[in-house]
Amino acid sequence: MRVLPLALAAAIFSGVTAILVYLSGLSSYGGARVSDADLAALGALQSGFSKCVDANGLGLKAIPGEDYCRVVIQYPSDTDSKWKDPKTGEPEGLSFEFNLCEAVASWEQVRNSTTILTKEYIDALPNGWEEYAWRRINKGIHLNKCQNRTLCMEKLSLVLPETPPYVPRQFGRCAVVGNSGDLLKTKFGDEIDSYDVVIRENGAPIQNYTEYVGTKSTFRLLNRGSAKALDKVVELDETKKEALIVKTTIHDIMNQMIREIPITNPVYLMLGTSFGSSAKGTGLKALEFALSMCDSVDMYGFTVDPGYKEWTRYFSESRKGHTPLHGRAYYQMMECLGLVKIHSPMRGDPGRVVKWAPTKDTIEAARVASEKLLKRPGAGSEGPLSSCTMIKKREKGKTPKRSVVRHAALKHLEYMRGATRYPLERNAGGGYLCMINER
């Protein structure tokens, strides 16, 4: 008769223990405890974010989700969704869920990392040449995982610096210029030329459009097709000083053009972070590149105003776009996280103030809390190297020679103790490789 009460007591004890473990797990991840202050920081970010989207989104509304991280950006119900999924034939939806914790943690890491592929990065990776290097070479699968390292190095050598040519905060004000046909509605040319750095995309021309897109061009992000036409791309900038950043792989035809024409512009391969199902295309990679080296980033020529009907380019015929409503919502999220400032025909005032934009303190507190919730490496720890998944020492004599003179960049290098942080592109769990100087 006493067996049942004992069994019941054991079950109750087990259940209570499970509940306590569960509740404990809600506030502690990998030793990094999520405090009440952390939750308050996320709540403040979410609340301010919703107000920012409502105030600046030209009809978009932000609806808080089921927790402090999630938010839904909603289009007006009368929005005419023109784009259809080529696989299903279904029109694009009018609401999109975003995870603010993921976005804050990922983008703030981008701001403190390099986005240029280097030789020291490949050398430092475990089996970097056998497992990674060949993937950055067109048809690299035929290179037998770079067992002949000399051959692989020969194919990469023209685009592979030893150490990063750019560092975080190296530049002040940067403009990323997209290719949208909306650029022809507003004469942004002089305004764009006033930036310290201008980043353009693919084969977008400058001549004949200068009053709309400006004349300055510091960098150009290239997709696969544009990279294979490198000889034509270099003609777009009369100064021939534009640095060309290829986001895919190096081709033999590219190497041939660099050597034989010759092309004297700097050419590099991009090393980037994965943002999952976020806005796609060269535009997002251009923003990522800009955020990795600029204090502030402004964007022009992205289709971000209401009334989208088709993907247009300012220099050619209309083309089929890709998830335009999702893209507009994602870029609005970026603006309301303080990452970029949007310029468009309906937002043409250069002095426009982004209402309810978060402060640096708000973002920093939310980043710390987000990293704890997401179990990011080093979450809750202090110090510049706490987020590093791997730390490797540079060989003697290979410390990067810095010509950086901006105070903000020098302060960043001082904070990082001279270390360089790289995103681990092919690491399923994300993470960062940090290269430190030999002391």
From Swiss-Prot:
One of its GO terms (biological process) is protein glycosylation. It is a single-pass type II membrane protein. The keyword Methyltransferase does not apply. The keyword Glycoprotein applies. Residues 24-439 are lumenal. The chain crosses the membrane at residues 3-23. Glycans are attached at N112, N148, N208. Its EC number is 2.4.-.-. Residues 1-2 are cytoplasmic. GO terms for cellular component: Golgi membrane. It is found in: Golgi apparatus membrane. It is an enzyme of class 2 (transferase). May possess sialyltransferase-like activity in vitro. Belongs to the glycosyltransferase 29 family. This is Sialyltransferase-like protein 4.
